[in-house]
UniProtKB/Swiss-Prot annotation:
Belongs to the RRN7/TAF1B family. It is found in: Nucleus, Nucleolus. Residues 74-259 are annotated as: N-terminal cyclin fold. The modification N-acetylmethionine is found at residue 1. The keyword NADP does not apply. This is TATA box-binding protein-associated factor RNA polymerase I subunit B. It holds the Pfam family Rrn7_cyclin_N. One of its GO terms (cellular component) is RNA polymerase transcription factor SL1 complex. Residues 260-370 are annotated as: C-terminal cyclin fold.
């Protein structure tokens, strides 16, 4: 039956009053505007009997097949919705509470769809370029209170129950937007791929694949889960959380090509600073209220994280007492400082993992100075003591720790670099510019796979890289006398002295990582030039920054900011002296 014959049915739709009808596989009329199915039916004549006949029908519930790719008509937001769903499922597999997927991330995503005017509003922005008007009863940030409240599904329904249940491949916890009666664009597999790429509005934060990680990170922070941003990035690297080529998780009916490639194809690893900035941007864009308090019993509190990282970098447990003192003196353990509040004037989240590592660096400087001299002198004393007192608890030997860590770190970094070099960026589901290039793209992909097989046969079977099991720790330290000796139980006795009722460090000197902070518009408070610092300091920063998957300069900056809080008096005196010198020049 031709489309012209369907137009003979002139009744208005009971839902939207439109006169635009199609036929389902069962021969019933359905509205192409709102997908409402009527009780009226029409006998469908077999297309095999009438040549060159087109039947306007739908399959798999109410989803329409595209005439170009024989797939679904889908929107870009549905693609990101699918990625978020699988990321949330992966986090749940890693031990995160199911509430994160079913409640927190679900509500964040609904709120994003509303704020970006893609759903949960009267006229969502679609390919026609229509502007959406947010419902008048939409919840403002001031009305949220302590809990996150969003528009209910009944306020502005997006899909019928029949459509939602018709497709088991679509993630259930997220709302499914309706397909358009129009077929997919010849320039993209999605209906709105071209328009989405060109959409530019003031204040709009467009969803990207990196921002899906930022949204997951915000959800983890809201739930106060035991996964930091650095852990999230590491799990992405280890392929426990989908990110690179995440579009391969789309159902086969969701064709990805053309402009979709620039939206969903990622050819670089996620960056800590980018995720951090995206978290702040999304929180502000969504008008999120103050997050739940980060108290001392939370995993993200610096005291807890410092203990975790002391175990990670194989340092003595006794150092935890010193890290707690630094946290108390600097005030970074206060609830108001740790709790993220997007509504506050200083819209910034605390880099909890980086901050904890910075505390450990400061404690190491307090103990050993790290000037390439004092730490080795203390090591000689510790080595001599351990030789004479073999039965006693050994004193911490910085030199021995350095040698063990360097060997382990070099091996770990070598394997990490090899894994990155071997990573297959191309997927078996190739991307192509248009549906016309599909056959060429698949032929090229097949050719590449054949060449890889032939090359592997020539050089011999390549070792199969096993997927690492997820773990909170990257290093495994064993008992003394093995390749990776454990320093956790070693004593700081030779590094501390009794003064009155308390123990203080034997070393009374300290050098500041940054003498003067930058006040320019570059937004960097300090710079890091390796040649200006001792080799010991460089070594520690390199190891710690590698564990967090951040740049060395980022950790150095956090150390400098922490020192500014710890030695505020010293910084003020330095500032006054520089000001007086300027006065004498004039």
């Amino acid at each position: 039956m031709d489309v012209e014959e369907v137009k003979a049915f002139r009744d208005r739709c009971s839902q939207c009053a439109a006169v635009s009808w199609g036929l389902t596989d069962e021969g019933k009329y359905y509205c192409t505007s709102c997908h409402n199915v009527t009780d009226r039916s029409e006998e469908v004549v077999s297309a095999a009997d009438i040549p060159n006949t087109k039947i306007n029908s739908i399959n798999r519930g109410l989803r329409q097949r595209s005439k170009h790719e024989k797939g679904w008509d889908w929107y870009v937001c549905e693609g990101f919705q699918c990625i978020l769903y699988h990321q949330a499922k992966a986090l749940e597999t890693l031990g995160v509470s199911p509430e994160l997927k079913n409640e927190v991330l679900h509500n964040f995503w609904k709120r994003y769809l509303q704020k970006s005017k893609q759903a949960y509003c009267k006229n969502p922005v679609r390919t026609s370029g229509r502007k959406a008007k947010v419902l008048e009863d939409s919840v403002q940030s001031s009305d949220l209170g302590s809990d996150l409240e969003l528009l209910s599904d009944t306020t502005c329904p997006l899909e019928s129950e029949a459509e939602f249940q018709s497709d088991p491949q679509i993630p259930k916890p997220f709302p499914v937007t309706k397909g358009s009666p129009k077929s997919a664009s010849v320039c993209s597999g999605s209906v709105d791929g071209v328009e989405y790429s060109e959409r530019k509005e003031k204040g709009l934060v467009k969803m990207t694949v990196p921002r899906t990680l930022a949204l997951c990170s915000l959800s983890l922070l809201w739930q106060r889960e035991t996964i930091t941003v650095s852990d999230l990035l590491r799990f992405v690297e280890e392929d426990h959380i989908p990110y690179i080529n995440a579009f391969k998780l789309f159902p086969e009916e969701m064709k990805v090509y053309g402009r979709d490639k620039g939206i969903f194809a990622i050819e670089s690893w996620p960056d800590y600073e980018d995720i951090y900035k995206n978290m702040i941007e999304l929180a502000i864009f969504l008008d999120l209220p103050r997050f739940p308090d980060i108290t001392e019993d939370c995993y993200l509190h610096p005291n807890t994280l410092c203990m975790k990282y002391l175990l990670e970098v194989n340092l003595p447990d006794e150092m935890h007492t010193l890290t707690c003192q630094v946290v108390k003196l600097t005030g970074i353990g206060e609830v108001d400082f740790l709790t993220f509040d997007p509504i506050a004037k200083t819209k910034r989240t605390v880099k909890y993992d980086v901050q904890a590592m910075a505390v450990i660096v400061v404690v190491l400087k307090l103990l050993f100075l790290l000037d390439d001299k004092l730490e080795w002198s203390y090591s000689d004393l510790a080595e001599a003591y351990n030789e004479q007192h073999r039965e006693d608890t050994p004193q911490f030997d910085f030199r021995k720790w350095y040698q063990v860590m360097k060997k382990t770190f070099d091996e770990k970094r070598r394997k990490w670099e090899e894994a990155r070099a071997r990573y297959a960026w191309k997927t078996k589901r190739p991307l192509y510019r248009s549906h016309i290039d599909k056959s060429v793209a698949y032929k090229r992909r097949k050719m590449v796979e054949n060449l890889q097989k032939q090359f592997s046969a020539l050089v011999g079977s390549s070792p199969v890289v096993e997927k690492q099991a997820p773990s909170s720790f990257q290093f495994n330290w064993t008992e003394e006398g093995t390749d990776s000796p454990c320093f956790h139980g070693h004593s700081l006795q030779g590094l501390l002295i009794m003064k009155g009722q308390s123990m203080i460090t034997k070393n009374s000197l300290y050098w500041l990582s940054t003498q003067k902070f930058c006040k320019s518009y570059c937004k960097h408070v300090t710079t890091y030039e390796e040649s200006n610092f001792s080799l010991s300091y460089q070594f520690i920063l390199n190891i710690f920054s590698f564990l967090l998957r951040i740049k060395t300069s980022a950790l150095h900056e956090e150390v400098s900011l922490l020192e500014k809080k710890l030695f505020e008096k010293k910084y003020n005196e330095s500032k006054k002296s520089s000001g007086s010198k300027k006065g004498r020049r004039h």
